[in-house]
C-alpha cells in the first residue's frame, strides 16, 4: 500500500533526524560532564549511561534503516 510505505519512510527519516540530534546532545553532555563534574566516580557513572543511551539511539536508527530498505525493496 503506497500510503503506508510513504508513512513508514517518513517515520524512518524522522528517526534518522532524531538520532543525529541525540548525537549532538550526547557530545554536548559529555563535554559538559568532563568540564564541570569534579567527582570522578560520578563522571564514570554518567559517561557509562551516556554511552548506553548512544548505543540505544544507534540501534533505533539501525532498525529504521532496515525498515526503510524493506519498504524500498517492496515498492
Task: Say what each PLM segment does.
Residues 1-75:
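Cytosolic, long alpha-helical scaffolding segments
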Amino acid at each position: 500500500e503506497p500510503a503506508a510505505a510513504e508513512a513508514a519512510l517518513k517515520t524512518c527519516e524522522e528517526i534518522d533526524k532524531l538520532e543525529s540530534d541525540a548525537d549532538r546532545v550526547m557530545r554536548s553532555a559529555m563535554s559538559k560532564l568532563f568540564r564541570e563534574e569534579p567527582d570522578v566516580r560520578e563522571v564514570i557513572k554518567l559517561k557509562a549511561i551516556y554511552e548506553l543511551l548512544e548505543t540505544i539511539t544507534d540501534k533505533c536508527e539501525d532498525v529504521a534503516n532496515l525498515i526503510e530498505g524493506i519498504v524500498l525493496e517492496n515498492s
